[in-house]
Design a protein with these regions (language model features):
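Small cysteine-rich, disulfide-bonded extracellular modules of the LU/uPAR three-finger superfamily
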Residues: 1-174, 182-224
């Protein structure tokens, strides 16, 4: 008996860790943008561009964006809701509500696709009817600093977590991340042709000079 209808489930997980010590700084699920994800998957299957990049190629996730608008703290920390919606509004991140609250940085990802039954390492096998995509970023101190200096040339990378330079500490602290289906250019990413696919908010993390931060963002696609 064949199935003419299947259920598709997409699950996103985020892990942020210190490369040198192996300390896990953040480990949680993230929110998928249903409207954008459905449209991007359909466009990719059909080999067609999205409406925000009508003269380009079919979309895929190739950028990770970081921001500092995902949480607030007074006596206790509170997290803002991920900006994901069930509809596709046809707008790029420059004019859509489907974007980070306060984007401060973006970096291209290194992606790895795992097939059903494939070993992801350590005997961790991908289940049947399932594939996983891992998007990895080892955050660049120099690129992050250069982007912050566009708005304030005095900003430098904080030496440690205990740095007293509050301006630099604020600039190098992030508490939200999104995966983007973007358009790469020789100078970076064209935001006017880019869509956000996922969004997650979490407690603030500081990118200091004595710490190398690695971000592993995994999307699991399962059919049943």
């Amino acid at each position: 008996m064949f199935k003419d209808k299947i259920n598709v489930q997409a699950i996103g997980t985020l892990k942020i860790s210190d490369k040198e010590t192996g300390t896990v700084l953040v480990d949680k699920r993230n929110a998928i943008h249903p409207g954008n994800m459905a449209y991007i998957m359909a466009s990719a299957l059909g080999g067609k561009p999205t409406s925000v990049n009508s003269s380009g190629s079919s979309p895929y996730i190739n950028w990770m964006a970081f921001g500092n608008g995902g949480s607030s703290s007074t006596t206790t920390i509170s997290y803002r809701s991920p900006r994901v919606f069930t509809t596709y509004d046809g707008l790029p991140i420059t004019s859509s509500n489907s974007t980070l609250y306060s984007k401060t940085y973006q970096q291209e990802v290194v992606s790895t696709v795992y097939a059903p039954g494939e070993d992801m390492g350590g005997g961790n096998l991908v289940p049947e009817n399932t594939s996983k995509v891992n998007f990895k970023v080892e955050m660049s101190h120099s690129e992050y600093e250069a982007m912050q200096q566009l708005s304030d040339p005095s900003i430098t990378t904080p030496a440690t977590d205990s740095s007293t330079d509050t301006t630099s500490v604020t600039a190098f602290t992030f508490d939200e991340i999104g995966l983007l289906a973007g358009v790469s250019t020789p100078t970076g990413m064209d935001e006017t042709k880019t869509l956000m696919v996922t969004h997650v908010t979490f407690h603030p993390v500081l990118l200091s000079a004595n710490r190398t931060i690695v971000v592993d963002y995994t999307i699991t696609v399962q059919l049943s």
